[in-house]
Amino acid sequence: MDTYPNQYIPKLILDYMSDELADSDFYKRLASTVKEKDVEEILRGISMDEEKHYKMLEKIYESITGQKANVTDFTPEELSDNIFLNLDKRVMEELNAVENYRSLMFALSEQWMRDYLTEIYTDEQNHAAKLSFLYSK
């Protein structure tokens, strides 16, 4: 178990885990509303990535605290009837997540944790690009 001078890190990780659950749920629900199979597949893929991020953050949390993270609560985000509004909002949220994860990465000392966060923020960048593509379709 690592100790970190910044005791806010475990709380941040729990918050980000909750965000990942909410994001996964949002993309899963959004995917179920679209008619185009390719759009549905992209949205389901993003949802699966968010679930993967949750699991990666869970491992980091457990390594830092020595405790199991049990985050199951999240506030479901409301879907708009207008898919473009959903996509537009999510692009900015994905880009904000990139910044959050990069900041967290710099606060961690273990290389494997930094590698996990690099993968997560790279995925979030890819999500923003995919959502922008869908918006332009």
Give residue spans per PLM region:
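Non-heme di-metal
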Residues: 1-137
